[in-house]
Amino acid sequence: MGSVVDAPVVVEGVAENMLGDKKVTVVFVLGGPGSGKGTQCANIVEHFGFTHLSAGDLLRAEIKSGSENGTMIENMIKEGKIVPSEVTIKLLQDAMIKNENDKFLIDGFPRNEENRAAFENVTKISPAFVLFFDCSEEEMERRLLGRNQGRVDDNIETIRKRFKVFVESSLPVIEHYNAKNKVKKIDAAKPISEVFEDVKAIFAPYAKVE
């Protein structure tokens, strides 16, 4: 997995860029529910100094706030639908602006081609690369059902809806970036420590300077 990683993509501040003159490196982290994205993002944060922005966590925080926006998001998630791009992009933008870091892992977004195009058009940011955690549905289902303190939406029917949404919506995003040689594919069915060895090889150019 020690392939050469694309140079970080930095974006000059332009009028349309909602981040102002802030230059950032963004890595999209994609993979099905239960593929281990969250665990590995935590490792990347610790070892390589990135800030982890989970689209799902940001959406759940909005739900918890009790806002009208949060109620709409909650209903869509229960139905296994994808939240409108502008809602998630606004949450991600706000998080990047507020954070002093300039290296971000965006986990679980873009979820579809419309998300992807909207993110690039609104923020003027193109990812340095896409980290794709590839894992079978059988293994992901086993992991999700085996969680001691699973999320409230971790029941088998909802899990399978989430798999279906991922396959139909997210795989075209991965194919789009693969055509640009921007996808770094990880075998996520392996044990956590082995997966991280593969991740470390990809992120070596981003090692923190002590």
Curated annotation (Swiss-Prot):
Its EC number is 2.7.4.14. ATP binds at residues 34-39, 147, 190. Consists of three domains, a large central CORE domain and two small peripheral domains, NMPbind and LID, which undergo movements during catalysis. The LID domain closes over the site of phosphoryl transfer upon ATP binding. Assembling and dissambling the active center during each catalytic cycle provides an effective means to prevent ATP hydrolysis. GO terms for cellular component: cytoplasm; nucleus. It comes from the Eukaryota. It is an enzyme of class 2 (transferase). Disulfide bonds: none annotated. Monomer. PROSITE patterns: ADENYLATE_KINASE. Its cofactor is Mg(2+). This is UMP-CMP kinase 3. Residues 146-154 are annotated as: LID. One of its GO terms (biological process) is CDP biosynthetic process. Binds 1 Mg(2+) ion per monomer. Residues 54-83 are annotated as: NMP. It is found in: Cytoplasm; Nucleus. InterPro entries: Adenylat/UMP-CMP_kin (IPR000850), Adenylat_kinase_CS (IPR033690), P-loop_NTPase (IPR027417), UMP_CMP_kinase (IPR006266). CMP binds at residue 115. It catalyses: UMP + ATP = UDP + ADP; CMP + ATP = CDP + ADP; dCMP + ATP = dCDP + ADP. Its main location: cytoplasm. Belongs to the adenylate kinase family. UMP-CMP kinase subfamily. Keywords: ATP-binding, Cytoplasm, Kinase, Nucleotide-binding, Nucleus, Pyrimidine biosynthesis, Transferase.
